[in-house]
Swiss-Prot record:
Job description of the protein: DNA-dependent RNA polymerase catalyzes the transcription of DNA into RNA using the four ribonucleoside triphosphates as substrates.
Cofactor note: Binds 1 Mg(2+) ion per subunit.
GO cellular component: DNA-directed RNA polymerase complex
Protein name as it appears in the record: DNA-directed RNA polymerase subunit beta'
EC number: 2.7.7.6
Oligomer status and interactors: The RNAP catalytic core consists of 2 alpha, 1 beta, 1 beta' and 1 omega subunit. When a sigma factor is associated with the core the holoenzyme is formed, which can initiate transcription.
Positions that bind Mg(2+): 472, 474, 476
Gene: rpoC
Any Gene Ontology biological process: DNA-templated transcription
């Protein structure tokens, strides 16, 4: 296979000088890969390797003609031939007349290749075995039959002549002999082995085959055949385009790679360490030579065939050991590493040497905290700095004339003479270094700092950057890298300095937020004192900050004393200040706390926990910009540490106060549980209901005890000081409510490793100590937690890698692509609570359409293509606008990457994204980085995790008129009504019939308000049984059971504990459908109800019932509901676009449901639309629970059965925009559960990449085939081209690819090969003759170029400033200095 850099003509002299200056990268702009012809291989080669020997064991010199021969591959020593006749550089390029070695540098042994002339052709295993087999596609044979030919089991007919044999027909030995006897020896040609395959390929006329295949394509209607034909077409057209011949896939000449790439190293004791490739080559040469000799000796066919097969197998092992048959093993039964293994996997050439390299000028050491540092500094041990900055020191020593040679300078440095230390100080001043902490999960894991030289061995880190690095000081290590070139230093100073990374790129929240001690100090200063002054009690009035500080220093006042000071914000607008009062009543601590913040914030007169500190920092940045914020942060750090130290807060066991009420609460719960057990014993409720009720009771109890605990801690039993446990928890410095509850209250319910909840809660707290049984129960959860953590870290890393790979090439390509399409954003509700407001979702995006003020329609709030600022977003939210369409990466039409407007504001900078920003990588990191925090939460409900119990009622949020929509009701005896279907909704409308609220109504809900009645805000609209899903009857009458066969469709179980018999519907294979029929007195059926699997039947046959009676009930699985798949696996499942196990059936059209019996053991459900006369039928497995009933009106995309939604179906039925909504909301839900904020735009970028392919449904006049997947941008461009030429454009449907698939489908074969399935990607690319245009990141890193993003964009890279000779550079007016160059 040959890979050629496609050369760009460049005059070589100019290139050499520029190359020497390090300006010009190697001059090529694309790389192509094709199948190499035998001529090409011979052209690469410098000679044939005939001898399997490597080096002479006595002289250690390479054997002539062997695998290390100097004549073929070049001299072992620089400028010295093998026999020693010519030595030194003066004989450069002379070929020695005695030993035939060219006198040159030894480095040529890394690039010169040899070759082996094979005695018989040999098939290349990649083209034979890599599925789909390329040889098979070309010859239209199966891989299996090809193998029989290539490994000399069968003959293949190549030219049938006049005989009735078919071309490419396989013949066994006996059949071959019979054919010869029958037709004569010369009447047809049949051969064995790769030779037969080569001859068949030589005879293939590619052009004619293409024409024939296209004809067949037109003729056939079968999708199966079309699929097969388009596969063959693709490969054959690939060969035509790349001007390669298919017979080149069978090798006649084998290339030998340069010897220095498969070295042989002598070890002590006379043994050698060798690369496995030498062994594999040696086998090939041995077998090849033996075969040659045998063929000259007129040996019997059997022996020759065997020898030929062995040669084929030897070459297979060399290319891809283990692909065919048993792998060839070396010493200790270890499979040898073949050429393919050299490329594959983490240790392969791509990932080990091309994408990740070891770096010079770097070191690593343990980190410790550096509270004395400024934000832009880090402490670097002098010993490390001396080594890292050595070249700079040497240069400076020479400049200052201390030494004249590099050796002298090195000696001076080794002696550590005093001048060296001074020069080190000078050299490191203003020269930033990069600090990196593994795992590098997002871009903030590498930041630049100015080094401050320190004694000792450990690197010192500023405490505020610990959050970004996720570092702590329990032995973490960090690596230091020194940027060398001027450009690198500038980028570090301007872009990577810790001071310019205040905000998190994933959510735009400050990431430099203080934690632990600093938070504790700040909270301690601002906390509300215990004693409130009485109503008319006088409080000292001081003149301001200075006087307060005097009073504190004097000991006259304490930090928590009330004091009155003049209000600095009187009469001016500030963010937190009070504009009205002239005198503020506050505490001494708060006066001190306020001195560090900028005046525009106003006087902060409330306690400041961690979350409020974040707000203060955000607002400081808005008011004063970057530099002032950085200075404020440093002041906050100083103040926090000092205060925390002076406060001397520590916790003792007595501070964990156990509430007295705990006993009574537990006793009360036990009483309630006894009642539940009694109900169960009488048989009123089922086992499942009993369990759920008990668990709900205990969850409620735990919450009540927790409330008591917090109340107790807050009041601190009437002591004067604030409880230290409470301070730590409330300030957010350490510990959360859950942990404190377990210390002082109860541990609560625990989960088994399977995720089920154990019914008996742990009632003791850690303060009281656990009993043996309780301790044992709690070990379950703890151990599972540890095992999960270990397993999940690898998964999170892998997810990040896949996301990076798929989104890598998304950069901002232009400022505006001109498209004004977009996606709708609306607020997110959970139940009745708004969790994410519309404002949060649209701020920082560009609006697609004009947004009008609903109250005054002539006013445009924001125009189309304009930025939605915070002010506008707040306005939109306040005016009650439901949804806004914003521009999105999903709808951007930019050719490569996306445009700045569709991305909006870059969360890390707060400014609109610039051309060249690598937003794809940022998106992948933002989603992957929190992945490590997403524990595999096995229990979302119960466990020590959380108790999620939704109240079984709907309260309305707005007053208005009730309107029923699509509800089927039945009146009950007491005049209320009960809902019978799952698909109905109730709307609340205002006087103008404008919809205010919509509620989905649960089946079995009891409605309190009639259709068209008025309802007040907060009134209860509907209630339902939280434990069961009922099956209710619409009609009254006598009951008859159908298909209820004990032991087949239903089982009667005796409930041990309650002693009653229950009838439950069970899973069944037969064509049966358990139903309850309702008949009128004459025995005519009025209605029939299918009873789902798992339901308990609540009536007996022959009963006479009223409308609305309960026929059966299915327990709602409450205790494991949320845990379908949680956390990380769920995110991976969504991004991989996997089809769920039992996906819900979705209606494909709007229409009315009807059932039409059973077909092949499945129920047939038909949706008919009378207006359009469409009908769609669905076959539904009997075990599945159908949630619609005959006669229901369903909408397109509505679920007909229970189950999870399938993203592919959503795309197919409802189109892309519904899919966007689905995926964004599902991914966000997982992260929200963990309290992680991620901006929607990151998820949108990944989804854009998953949807970038379309599948051709009709090729029209384009060159595409039916069923081919092509890039959306390519597809549109090709169609435009065809339309301009007046042809028929192609048609296609969007398809959703999982991120792994999408990564492998990139345009660039280099990028795909370095991701996964290397051999398959390269095989594919070479047969299609692909050309890599080096547009993306990975391929450029691999080729050693700058990446085409940020400062590496061609438009910046090739920037030239032209000025008349002697002119000065234009000087920009003075700007305030950026924070990065802040003086210490």
């Amino acid at each position: 296979m040959s890979i050629q850099p496609s050369e760009v003509a460049a005059s070589s002299a100019r290139t050499d000088t520029r190359e020497a200056l390090g300006i010009e990268e190697s001059a090529f702009d694309c790389v192509s890969i094709t199948v190499a012809s035998p001529e090409t291989i011979r052209k690469w080669s410098k000679g044939e390797v005939k001898n399997p020997e490597t080096i002479n064991y006595r002289t250690f010199k390479p054997e002539p003609g062997g695998l290390f021969c100097q004549k073929i591959f070049g001299p072992v020593r620089d400028y010295e031939c093998a026999c020693g006749k010519y030595k030194r550089i003066k004989y450069k390029d002379v070929v020695c007349d005695r030993c035939g070695v060219e006198v040159t540098i030894a480095r040529v042994r890394r690039e010169r290749m040899g070759h082996i002339e094979l005695a018989v052709p040999v098939a290349h295993i990649w083209f034979l075995k890599s599925m789909p087999s390329r040889l098979g596609l070309l010859l239209d044979m199966t891989a299996r039959s090809l193998e029989r030919v290539i490994y000399y089991e069968n003959y293949m007919v190549i030219d049938p002549g006049k005989t009735p044999l078919e071309p490419h027909q396989l013949l066994t030995d006996t059949e071959y002999r019979q054919a010869i006897d029958e037709y004569g020896e010369d009447s047809f040609v049949a051969k064995m082995g790769a030779e037969a395959v080569r001859d068949a390929l030589v005879k293939t006329d590619l052009e004619a085959t293409v024409a024939e295949l296209q004809e067949q394509m037109r003729a056939t209607k079968s999708k199966q055949i079309k699929k097969k034909l388009s596969k063959r077409l693709k490969v054959i057209q690939g060969f035509i385009h790349s001007k390669s011949r298919p017979e080149w896939m069978v090798l006649e000449v084998l290339p030998v790679i340069p010897p220095d790439l498969r070295p042989l190293v002598p070890l002590e004791g006379g043994r050698f360490a060798t690369s496995d490739l030498n062994d594999l080559y040696r086998r090939v040469i041995n077998r090849n030579n033996r075969l040659r000799n045998l063929m000259q000796l007129k040996t019997p066919d059997v022996i020759i065939h065997n020898e030929k097969r062995m040669l084929q197998e030897a070459v297979d092992a060399l290319f891809d050991n283990g692909r065919h048959g048993r792998p060839v093993t070396g010493a200790g039964n270890r499979p040898l590493k073949s050429l393919s293994d050299m490329l594959k996997g983490k240790q392969g050439r791509f990932r080990q040497n091309l994408l990740g390299k070891r770096v010079d000028y770097s070191g690593r050491s343990v980190i410790v905290i550096g509270p004395e540092l400024k934000l832009h500094q880090c402490g670097l041990p002098k010993k490390m700095a001396l080594v890292l900055f050595e070249p700079f020191i040497i240069r400076r020593l020479k400049e200052l004339g201390f030494v004249h040679t590099v050796r002298g300078a090195r000696k001076m440095i080794e002696k550590k003479s005093p001048e060296v230390w001074d020069i080190l100080e000078e050299v490191t001043k203003g020269h930033p270094v990069l600090l990196n902490r593994a795992p590098t999960l997002h871009r903030l894991s590498i930041q630049a700092f100015e080094p401050v030289l320190i004694e000792g061995e450990a690197i010192r880190v500023h405490p505020l950057v610990c959050t970004a690095y996720n570092a702590d000081f329990d032995g973490d290590q960090m690596a230091v890298h020194v940027p060398l070139s001027l450009e690198a230093i500038m980028e570090c100073k301007l872009l990577m300095m810790a001071t310019s990374n205040i905000f998190s790129p994933s959510s735009g929240k400050p990431i430099l937020t203080p934690s632990q001690d600093i938070v504790l100090g700040a909270y301690y200063l601002t906390v509300e004192p215990r004693k409130k002054p009485a109503k008319d009690e006088r409080v000292p009035l001081l003149s301001g900050l200075q006087e307060v500080l005097y009073a504190v220093a004097d000991g006259a006042m304490k930090k928590h004393d009330w004091v009155e000071v003049p209000n600095p914000d009187h009469g001016r607008e500030t963010i937190f200040g009070n504009k009205e009062k002239k005198v503020l009543r506050t505490t001494v601590g708060r006066v001190i706390f306020n001195q560090i913040w900028p005046a525009g914030l106003g006087f902060v007169n409330f306690p400041v926990p961690k979350s409020k500190l974040g707000d203060l920092i955000l607002n400081t940045h808005k008011l004063t910009g970057n530099q002032a914020t950085v200075e404020t942060l440093d002041r906050l750090k100083e103040l926090g540490f000092t205060t925390a130290m002076q406060a001397g807060i520590s916790i003792g066991i007595d501070d964990m106060i156990i509430p007295e009420a705990k006993k009574d609460i537990v006793a009360e719960t036990r009483k309630k549980i006894a009642e539940v057990e009694a109900q169960f014993n009488k048989g009123i409720i089922t086992e499942g209901e009993r369990k759920n009720k008990v668990i709900d009771l205990w969850t409620g109890t735990t919450d009540r005890i927790a409330k008591e605990v917090f109340a107790k801690l807050e009041s601190n039993e009437g002591r004067n000081e604030v409880n230290p446990v409470y301070i730590m928890m409330d300030s957010g410095a350490r510990g959360n409510k859950q942990q404190v509850r377990q210390l002082c209250g109860t541990r609560g319910l625990m989960a088994k490793p399977s995720g089920e909840i154990i019914e008996r809660p742990i009632l003791s707290s850690f303060r009281e100590g656990l009993t043996v049984l309780e301790y044992f129960i709690s070990t379950h959860g703890a151990r599972k937690g540890l095992a999960d953590t270990a397993l999940k870290t690898a998964d999170a890393g892998y997810l990040t890698r896949k996301l990076c790979d798929v989104a890598m090439d998304v950069i901002i390509a232009e400022d505006d692509c001109g498209s004004r399409d977009g996606v709708w954003k609306k607020a997110i509700f959970e139940g009745d609570d708004e969790i994410v407001s519309l404002r949060e979702r649209i701020v920082g995006r560009f609006s697609s359409d004009d947004v009008f003020n609903p109250i005054n329609p002539s006013e445009i709030l924001v125009g189309s293509g304009e930025l939605i600022t915070e002010e506008i977003a707040t306005r939109v939210d306040e005016l009650g606008i439901e949804r806004v369409k914003v521009m999105s990466p999903l709808t951007s039409t930019a050719q490569h990457g996306i445009d700045g407007k569709s991305y909006g504001i870059n969360p890390a900078t707060g400014k609109v994204a610039k051309v060249g920003d690598s937003v794809g990588i940022i998106a992948a990191q933002s989603i992957g980085e929190p992945g490590t925090q997403l524990t595999m939460r096995t229990f979302h409900i119960g466990g020590v995790a959380s108790g999620g119990f939704k109240t079984p009622e709907i309260k309305v949020r707005a007053s208005g008129t009730v309107r029923y929509r699509g509800l089927r009701l039945v009146e009950t005896a007491d005049g209320g009504s009960i809902v019978l279907n799952k698909t109905g909704t109730i709307q609340i409308v205002d006087a103008e019939e404008k919809e205010l609220e919509t509620y989905n109504i649960v089946v079995g809900s009891f409605l309190h308000v009639g259709d068209g009645e008025q309802i007040q805000k907060g009134a209860i609209l509907a209630q339902w049984d939280p434990y069961n899903i009922p099956v209710l009857s619409e009609k009254g009458g006598t009951l008859a059971f159908k298909d209820m066969i004990p032991g087949v469709t239903v089982k009667r179980e005796l409930d041990e504990s309650s002693g009653r018999i229950a009838t439950v519907v069970i899973e069944h294979k037969e064509d049966l459908n358990p139903q309850i029929e309702i008949r009128d007195p004459k025995g005519k059926p009025l209605a029939a109800y299918s009873i789902p699997v798992g339901a308990q039947i609540a009536v007996n046959e022959g009963d006479i019932i009223q409308p609305g009676a309960l026929l059966a009930k299915t327990p709602r699985q409450a205790s494991k509901t949320k845990d379908i798949t949680g956390g990380l696996p769920r995110v991976a499942e969504l991004f991989e676009a996997r089809r769920p196990k039992d996906a819900a059936e979705m209606s494909r059209i709007d229409g009315i449901v009807s059932f039409e019996g059973t077909v092949r053991g499945k129920r047939k459900l038909v949706v008919k639309n009378d207006d359009t006369a469409q009908e769609e039928e669905h076959l539904i497995a009997t075990g599945k629970h159908i949630i619609v009933q005959p006669g229901d009106v369903v909408h397109k995309g509505q679920h007909l059965t229970e189950g999870a939604a399938d993203p592919h179906e959503i795309l197919e039925i409802l189109g892309p925009s519904a899919l966007y909504d689905f995926l964004i909301s599902q991914v966000q839900e997982v992260y929200r559960l963990q309290g992680v904020a991620i901006n929607d735009k990151h998820i949108e970028i990944i989804i854009r990449q998953m949807l970038r392919k379309v599948r051709i449904t009709d090729p029209g006049d384009t060159e595409n085939f039916w069923g081919e997947q092509v890039d959306r941008a390519q597809f549109l461009a090709e169609n435009r081209r065809i339309e301009e030429a007046g042809g028929k454009p192609a048609e296609a449907e969007p398809i959703l690819l999982g991120i792994t698939k999408a990564s492998l489908e990139t345009e660039s074969f280099i990028s795909a090969a370095s991701f996964q399935e290397t051999t398959r990607v390269l095989t594919d690319a070479s047969t299609l003759g692909k050309v890599d245009m080096l547009k993306g990141f990975k391929e450029n890193v691999i080729m050693g170029h700058l990446i085409p993003a940020g400062t590496g964009l061609p438009k910046y890279k090739n920037l030239k400033i032209t000025l008349p000779f002697g002119a000065d550079l234009p000087v920009e007016p003075e700007q305030p200095a950026p924070a990065a160059t802040e003086t210490a």
